[in-house]
Curated annotation (Swiss-Prot):
The lineage of its organism: Bacteria, Thermotogati, Deinococcota, Deinococci, Thermales. One of its GO terms (molecular function) is flavin adenine dinucleotide binding. Belongs to the FADH(2)-utilizing monooxygenase family. GO terms for biological process: phenylacetate catabolic process. FAD binds at residues 142-144, 148-151, 185, 444-447. Utilizes FADH(2) supplied by HpaC, to catalyze the hydroxylation of 4-hydroxyphenylacetic acid, leading to the production of 3,4-dihydroxyphenylacetic acid (DHPA). Its EC number is 1.14.14.9. It catalyses: 4-hydroxyphenylacetate + FADH2 + O2 = 3,4-dihydroxyphenylacetate + FAD + H2O + H(+). Substrate binds at residues 100-104, 142, 197-198. Pathway: Aromatic compound metabolism; 4-hydroxyphenylacetate degradation; pyruvate and succinate semialdehyde from 4-hydroxyphenylacetate: step 1/7. This is 4-hydroxyphenylacetate 3-monooxygenase oxygenase component.
């Protein structure tokens, strides 16, 4: 059933993840200064499911119980649109800056479950895990990337065969795994999902695996990077105080994975095709397009308010820059709409959003985002670094700040609050991390384009040109005759 924020927080207190920060075990992330902000933010998302204003958007009813909308297995385009509306509502709460809200990976697990026959002997495990996640409404994280030890060599060619996560042995109770994965974003989750990573070569069977575990599992460790939380003040740090999700290295120190939590084992082909064959790639990208749309809307809103606030909106070059963001926003909306309107069933009967539209969005946005960020910096200019704190306004020089930092259409404190938001979106550590995240969210941009080149059906367009040239040659020969 749809969870509440209090239930999420209580689960973190009762079964905290094995979280390490600056060499120390984090015993209670709900009160830790680095993590308490994102914990409150996640709890607020769960509570939104119970708000009478949003209940019908964020949840659906099945067998007398209400579940999060991201668990709905779509049968119609209307179902897809309902899922998209729920994605967008959650994304709007944090200006599209939260990449690991639960709906992101719920979309993957839902697609896996709806296409469970793909997983052969582990099909029932996948179905059961979906029902478990849905009924408990758990938060999940995942880790896809192998440690960057030697990127020129496959997993089996690393200095230690257990640098990437691999199977050590099989027992009556399950499989024992050892190794590590990088970039587990949002470790304040109930569960961690280890799904297929990069394409595996033949002979890499011990790395061909997919499974899920509670984040509190013995032998499982999340080692955090340095925090980007600037402080507790939502005035000074409007984003990092609330949406610092944290990124981690995940270590598996001979961890037992029970058989009922194993989804793929030793099958390289299944691993390599899992996302595409099940529709998980499309459904994950559907959530992402809604998220990026919300993010682009936020940049547009901030840019427009900044320009108006300091009287810069009268200049043509400023209008041009803001219009550029509008163009990008409308492109994302078009990708999103087409993905839903041209959805088709996959081989397992799951309605899947159109991949062509989604591939367009997920290849374009990593190139758009740095430009969107740059536009905000160009509009804000020196105003983005002349930003006193909340305490300065309350201090003895407050009256001076009210005079010198006012805007054409804003009081001083309003103007500084707006520009501090723009600073947190662009120039702060949080803002810089957001750009890196967007550049590589779906992987190496060059490989992404190569994949698009290889999977996209170019034949109809090639044939049109052949026919055109053939007709042109025919006309030329007739004229010559």
């Amino acid at each position: 059933m749809a969870r509440t924020g209090a239930e999420y927080i209580e689960a973190l207190k009762t079964r905290p993840p094995n979280l390490w920060y600056k060499g120390e075990k984090v015993e209670d992330p709900t009160t830790h200064p680095v993590f308490r902000g994102i914990v409150r933010t996640m709890a607020a998302l769960y509570d939104l499911q119970h708000d009478p204003r949003y209940r019908e958007v964020l949840t659906y009813e099945e067998e007398g119980k209400r579940h999060g909308m991201s668990f709905l297995i779509p049968k119609t385009k209307e179902d897809l649109k309902r899922r998209g509306q729920a994605y967008k509502l959650w994304a709007d709460q944090n200006l599209g800056m939260m990449g690991r809200s639960p709906d992101y990976l719920n979309a993957v697990v839902m697609a896996y479950a709806a296409s469970a026959d793909y997983f052969g002997e582990f099909a029932e495990n996948v179905r059961n895990y979906y029902r478990y996640l849905r009924d408990q409404d758990l938060a999940t994280t995942h880790a896809l990337t192998n440690p960057q030890v030697n990127r020129a060599r496959p997993p089996s060619g690393q200095p230690d065969p257990y640098i990437p996560v691999g199977v050590v042995k099989q027992t009556e109770k399950g499989i024992v795994v050892r190794g590590a994965r990088m970039t587990a974003t949002f470790p304040l989750a109930d569960e961690v999902l280890i799904f297929p990573s990069t394409l595996l070569q033949a002979g890499s069977e011990k790395y061909a695996l997919a499974f899920a575990l509670p984040t509190s599992t013995p032998g499982l460790h999340f080692v955090c990077r340095e925090a980007l939380v600037g402080g507790d003040s939502p005035f000074d740090h409007p984003l990092s105080s609330r949406v610092e999700e944290m990124d981690c290295l995940v270590i598996f120190d001979d961890v037992l994975v029970p058989w009922e939590r194993v989804f793929i084992l030793g099958n390289v082909e299944l691993c390599n095709n899992a996302y595409a064959a099940t529709g998980a790639l499309n459904h994950m990208a559907h959530q992402v397009v809604a998220l990026k749309t919300a993010k682009t809307e936020a940049f547009l809103g901030v840019a427009a308010l900044m320009a108006e606030g300091i009287g810069a909106d009268v200049y043509g070059h400023v209008q041009e820059k803001i219009a550029e963001i509008i163009v990008y926003l409308e492109a994302m909306r078009a990708f999103w709409t087409r993905a839903e309107e041209e959805a088709k069933e996959n081989a397992y009967g799951l309605l899947v959003p159109d991949r062509g539209a989604l591939d367009g969005a997920r290849n374009l946005y990593p190139r758009l985002y740095p430009r969107i960020r740059e536009i905000l910096e160009q509009i804000g200019a020196s105003g983005l670094i002349t930003l006193p704190s909340e305490k300065d306004f309350k201090g003895p020089l407050g009256p001076f700040l009210e005079k010198f930092l006012q805007g054409a259409a804003l009081e001083a404190k309003e103007r500084v609050a707006l520009f501090r938001l723009a600073w947190d979106m662009t120039l702060s550590g949080f803002g810089a991390r957001q750009e890196l995240y967007e550049r590589f969210f779906f992987g190496d941009p060059v490989r992404m384009y190569q994949t698009l080149y290889n999977v996209y059906n170019k034949e109809p367009y090639k044939e049109r040109i052949r026919a055109f040239l053939k007709e042109s040659l025919k006309v030329f020969e007739e004229v010559q005759a």
